Amino acid sequence: MPRQAGQSGWAKPLRVDGSNARCQWSRTTKSPLIVRDLDLLTELDRRNAVEVHITITSVDPRLARRLEVQAPDPQARLRTVSRLAEAGISTRVNCMPVMPGINDGEEALVPLFERAKAAGATDVHAAALFLRPATRAVFFPWLEEEFPGLVGLYRRLFAHRDYLGEAAKDALLKTYRRLRLEPGLPRPLAGRA
């Protein structure tokens, strides 16, 4: 009988008997609980290309708490990156969403890149905020409460669309793109091309 993961619901369907060999497999999470299945991830990685993406919008604990009220602390997520990287699992940090005037500047991104590299992340990816109607209904009241000085900017940026226009998106991600080109990222994982 093939071994199945025991504790985590997401891992139950994963087979590690070789029948799914040579697959690319990834998991995106904010939760440090993924390390409960480190043995399964390591075993899967022997025959597959396993990558875990840990979402961290900010390494500043106060800002992170404002952005993600119920998410695990960013320091706990960075420790998760370290544990996965130490086990040889390719681990990427996702800075998502990047939000104008909130977490898009050097004061937010430089520490995130430094901490992600120090933790052993193979890369840092980012994506701009987008606001579909259901999200917009929750987002703007939150923005008025947390960042009232930015409400006008966001209303202009998202007045007639769910996604930022190309010029606004390019401006938003400019610092991220520059930092990602600095030495150290993306880094290859030993044993992989």
Stretch-by-stretch model annotation:
Residues 1-157, 161-164:
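Conserved AdoMet/S-adenosylmethionine-binding subsite of the radical SAM
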Residues 145-155, 159-193:
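C-terminal accessory extensions appended to soluble enzyme cores
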